């Protein structure tokens, strides 16, 4: 009985020991690598565990690469994983590039992956070009008619410029700029409607893919529509603005005229006050002249008669003017 218990304890200890060893050493993965012809040491897998690198994240892509004929070192795969890269996607990209006869080295693919680009998608796009559809671009021809253009841009990924190259947004912006420039240089919107391919030829010859991660293969005009008459609208707005400016200037002149009128009225009142003041000095001057003997009494009365006669004639003239006015009415 004692021997049986001792045997159970020994078996239990052996089971615990093997469980710890197998959990620390991926024995099944090591056997799979050997079966696939990948030479990898058991202690290499243990080292991955110590460096907290999941061995299956490295060994499975390595098996895939070796089977595809890729010469990849396990240390490079582990270093790429520790740098935050996607090892499996890099290996898939290398295999896809090899099948498509595209020159792509592991270092280049790893750099593209670490730069945040989808290296596998880039390789696939190099084989199967992608069509980018631009939004509707509105441009105005020289005759003032708006033309709305929609284009499709066929691009292919440029592996050599994926790191540091501009993306799809830059391509769309440059194509839109080229469309606006081409339509704007057309003498009439009819030229654009008759020859829409002239837009694609002109834009394609501008080398819009410079500095981008893509190579433009073709630019096709998908749709061309006629929009608003921008020229006429601008002329209407300009005429309205000129009208408002003229009204403002007329109002300014009217205000100045009113101010000038008020100034003249004030001057008239001032002159009248001076006349009244001067008339008040006349009796004093007459008295002084009579006192000093410069005029006689008869001269004074003659002057008074002339003044009275003048006043009578003025009154007759006013009465005649009033009667004529009444007869006209």
Curated annotation (Swiss-Prot):
Keywords for this protein: Cell membrane, Membrane, Transmembrane, Transmembrane helix
Transmembrane segments annotated in the record for this chain: 5-25, 27-47
UniProt keyword annotation of Cell membrane present: yes
Protein location: Cell membrane; Membrane raft
Entry keyword annotation includes Cell division: no
A GO CC term attached to the entry: membrane raft
Assembly behavior: Homooligomerizes.
Family label: Belongs to the flotillin-like FloA family.
Protein's job: Found in functional membrane microdomains (FMM) that may be equivalent to eukaryotic membrane rafts. FMMs are highly dynamic and increase in number as cells age. Flotillins are thought to be important factors in membrane fluidity.
Classification via NCBIfam families: PRK13665.1
Protein name: Flotillin-like protein FloA
Species: Thermoanaerobacter pseudethanolicus (strain ATCC 33223 / 39E) (Clostridium thermohydrosulfuricum)
Gene transcribed to yield this protein: floA
